[in-house]
Amino acid sequence: GLGDVYKRQAIGAQMALGRDQRVVMFTGDGSFHMNLNEACTAVSYELPIITVIFNNQVLGMVRQWQTAFYGKRFSQTDPHRKTNFVKLAEGFGLKGYHCENLAQFQEAFADALKQKGPTWIECMIDKDEKVLPMIPGGGDINDIIMK
């Protein structure tokens, strides 16, 4: 739901912490596409950021809002792209992982911790998986949606 801010925050945190500690960043595939250029910075500086990409192959937060507030009238939420994040990582010279279940994620994460530079872990999720809690537009903490 934060679109274009995730990567630079992870880069800043990793620069502040140094290479002895690991930053783990969680993002969606849509957000990752919006900031692919920032991956170049992490690669150039060999920052050991572990990026976990929740891939539902749609713009999940937009779809979630359209489900909750617009009667599932979906508009512009399916970009019709099926990115292979493992091959994309390899194109950057990185280690990439593709996970379909928790056991695969646990194995990938354990291996990612051993890598020296950035790594990407793609986790496939259902296109209707929700990100909660959320506060509706114009609302406050009293309007929080928990389920």
Predicted regions located by residue number:
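Thiamine diphosphate
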Residues: 3-147
